């Protein structure tokens, strides 16, 4: 019977990705699921001049010698950013053109995803472990093709997948957000997307819904309230539900055995909606901490066990 390790919202943290891959052996799991928003959000330029590199991280400008730049690049990747060595002239090009910035980020980001797929191919070879990735609303569409080419990682988006007698459906799309991200749409369209998969599930008692967005008003979707200028209200202490009504409706109607979510980093938890166990393991990728859920499944007993872990 499958033992699932589920993590989400790694946002480019290579430390978290390595921990994710190592979790199969550490926790004796045979299925790894990365639930969305796997890519980083920014490039950190390392400007090469006079035998050293200058860079800015966390508002601090620092210098490093050519001999130490590799260690700095590893540190940047651990925090979820993409290091990029540039000349002063190249930095000026990036500063002057939004199109150059966008094109450069996309290529560096895709190179980063390829790096992760290569790591997965190396670490999972010969283990029999199945690994699934379902890009989330923050991930650009070109990411999908990189994942499709991987040998040991399977793309989850839009598919029904059999996992030892359990049927998993997956989507990284979300309801609308204030940030106009890559994979978001109206609740109506999201409902159609989910129904297209869920309607094909033969038995909800052995169904897993891997849906990046958590269900509305489930307790797994509480995010700090923001104003019209995208600033935190009341110092971030005011929370409001921002989950998807389409996801909530799908869970209420189909009642799958298990639903896996992410998207809202602060809303870690596990709740039951009818017969469905819904889990959001949360995310602390900035700290290099991998937050996850381990779920043991049995075709007769359903959910044998589950545990929220971090490390």
Show which residues each predicted segment covers.
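Binuclear metal-dependent phosphoesterase catalytic core
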Residues: 12, 160-164, 181, 185, ...
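Active-site environment of divalent metal-dependent phosphoester hydrolases
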Residues: 11-15, 39-43, 129, 133-144, ...
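Core catalytic region of metal-dependent phosphoesterases/phosphodiesterases
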Residues: 15-163
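Active-site-proximal segments of metal-dependent phosphoesterases and phosphodiesterases across multiple
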Residues: 99-110, 114, 208-255
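Binuclear metal-dependent hydrolase catalytic cores centered on His/Asp/Glu-rich metal-binding motifs
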Residues: 166-207, 231, 237-245
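Divalent metal-coordination and catalytic microenvironments
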Residues: 9, 17, 32, 37, ...
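Active-site-proximal beta-strand elements of phosphoester/diester hydrolases
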Residues: 2-11, 165-177, 208-212, 277-283, ...
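Catalytic phosphate/metal-binding cores of nucleic-acid and nucleotide-processing enzymes, i.e., regions
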Residues: 14-19, 27, 161, 204, ...
């Amino acid at each position: 019977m499958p033992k699932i390790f589920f993590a989400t919202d790694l946002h480019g943290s290579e430390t978290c990705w390595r921990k994710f891959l190592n979790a199969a052996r550490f926790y004796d799991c045979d299925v790894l699921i990365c639930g969305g928003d796997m890519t980083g959000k920014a490039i950190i330029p390392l400007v090469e001049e006079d035998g050293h590199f200058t860079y800015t991280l966390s508002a601090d400008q620092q210098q490093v010698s050519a001999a130490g730049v590799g260690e700095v690049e590893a540190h940047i990747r651990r925090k979820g950013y993409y290091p990029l060595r540039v000349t002063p002239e190249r930095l000026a090009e990036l500063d002057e053109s939004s199109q150059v910035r966008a094109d450069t980020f996309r290529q560096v980001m895709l190179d980063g995803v390829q790096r992760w797929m290569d790591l997965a191919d190396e670490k999972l070879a010969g283990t029999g472990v199945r690994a699934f990735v379902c890009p989330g609303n923050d991930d650009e569409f070109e990411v999908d093709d990189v994942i499709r080419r991987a040998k040991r990682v399977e793309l989850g988006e839009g598919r029904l997948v059999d996992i030892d007698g359990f049927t998993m459906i997956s989507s990284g799309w979300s309801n609308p957000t204030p940030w106009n991200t890559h994979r978001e749409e109206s609740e109506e369209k999201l409902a159609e997307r989910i129904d297209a998969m869920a309607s094909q599930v033969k038995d909800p008692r052995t169904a897993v819904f891997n849906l990046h967005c958590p269900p509305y008003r489930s307790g797994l979707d509480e995010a700090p309230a923001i104003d019209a200028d995208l600033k935190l209200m009341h110092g971030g202490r005011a929370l409001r539900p921002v989950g998807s009504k389409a996801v909530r409706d799908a869970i209420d109607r189909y009642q799958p055995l298990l639903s896996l979510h992410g998207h809202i980093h602060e809303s870690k938890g596990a709740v039951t909606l009818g017969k469905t166990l819904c889990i959001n393991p949360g995310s602390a990728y900035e700290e290099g901490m991998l937050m996850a859920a381990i779920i043991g499944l049995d075709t007769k007993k359903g959910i044998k066990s589950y545990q929220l872990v971090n490390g």
